[in-house]
Amino acid sequence: MLDERIYESYIGILKEEMVPAMGCTEPIALAYGAARAREVLGKEPEHITAKCSGNIIKNVRCVIIPNSGGLTGIEAGVVLGAVAGNASLNMEVLSNVNEFERKRCRELLDKKICKVELLDSPVVLHFIIEMQAGDDTVSLEIKYDHINVTKIVKNQEVLLDSDHKSGETPAAADRTLLNLEDIKTFADTVEIDDVKEIIENQIRSNMAIAHEGMTGKYGLGIDRIIRETYSNDMLTKMRSLTAAASEARMGGCDMPVVINSGSGNQGIACSVPLIVYAREMELPDYVLYRALVFSNLLTVYQKQYIGKLSAFCGAVSASCAAGAGITYMGGGELSVIKKTIENTLANIPGIICDGAKISCAAKIAASLDAAFLAHHLAMNGQSYAPYTGILKEEAGETISCVGQIGKEGMKETDKEILRIMLERV
């Protein structure tokens, strides 16, 4: 059995990370910040400046904002949040936008009331919303996490100043306690009632948007191409449904997703493949619940090293966790699960992140292909030897090394990606 402190921390991590969000999380974060700033200002702004870190710019430029009528971009997310956002709904801030508010948003965008500036900051998730109406001004800063407001200033008066020097959002749950052994033990032994509501919400929400993606017209429709091109096997079903959910989300669908590590695509990628597998294999609900607990915690564990935003695509981490979760459901011992992780990371330790957009679905499909191959290799007793490339003696060490590459080694790559993306702007 796990120590009570670890058990409660793991429950806390799941509650903090697995929350519903509507739309891609970075534009939603901007909308939330703008909605909060508008509340403080107390009136519709006449001028707005959005100062955004490079990773925020990268992840907002190309993705369709939900309930916007097809709008994309930082200005649209900020102005819609200011006009129609309900900050009390957190990551579902834009869930109640009406047609009048959409029209007003377009009018203000036509007037170009919002300008965007690059914020030179070492914090990858960092932006400041500045608003002005008449003689009143407001500045609101969000850092480290999508709705973590660290500073509010109105008319030169500081209303809030709670910057967290650790570089992490303060949380009740201690993420430093995460490790593969304890994650496996926790998944094996957790009281189902302690996680049932969170897990069932993830199953319900993420599968609903997956089916919406299959029937609606979003992106390139790669789910259909996958189904028509490949045999109707388990992998095809997993890849097509997961890609469909991602395309719907990136394509502006207003249905909520239960996210992981601040990302809807990661929440989708670490859950939908397991749900498909469990249903195809007719496994009991409790087996799926425990596997989803394992997969979600493994995703968080990997992202602790990489960071919420980086030059690495988070779909790889989540797909790696999905592959390991399938091994878990298939009865694989911890040693076999570790082989699945190592096999995945030996194949695709990282795909570059060039922003949130509809092609994220293709990256998820490719990552799941690698993860499912890794699963089958591991279940057949095959794995790459330690020190094959970046692999270490233990899977946990390899995860740490991949995180180090993504967080530190790829900093200059991230800057170059942003430079290339902004060339035509």
What name fits each language-model region?
Residues 1-11, 44-58, 233-252, 285-302, ...:
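Acidic-glycine-rich active-site phosphate/pyrophosphate-binding loop
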Residues 2, 21-25, 55-59, 63-66, ...:
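A structural signal for small-residue-enriched, beta-sheet-centric alpha/beta enzyme cores
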Residues 2, 44-48, 89-94, 115-117, ...:
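Flexible, glycine/charged-enriched surface loops at secondary-structure junctions
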Residues 10-20, 56-64, 249-259, 299-309, ...:
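Glycine/charged-rich beta-loop-alpha catalytic/anionic-binding loops adjacent to active sites
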Residues 20-36, 255-272, 313-318:
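Conserved phosphate/anionic-ligand binding catalytic regions in large, soluble enzymes, centered on
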Residues 28-127, 131:
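Early transmembrane hairpin of solute transport permeases
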Residues 37-40, 66, 277-290, 300-366, ...:
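Hydrophobic alpha-helical bundle architecture
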Residues 109-252, 418-425:
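Signature of multi-pass transmembrane helix bundles
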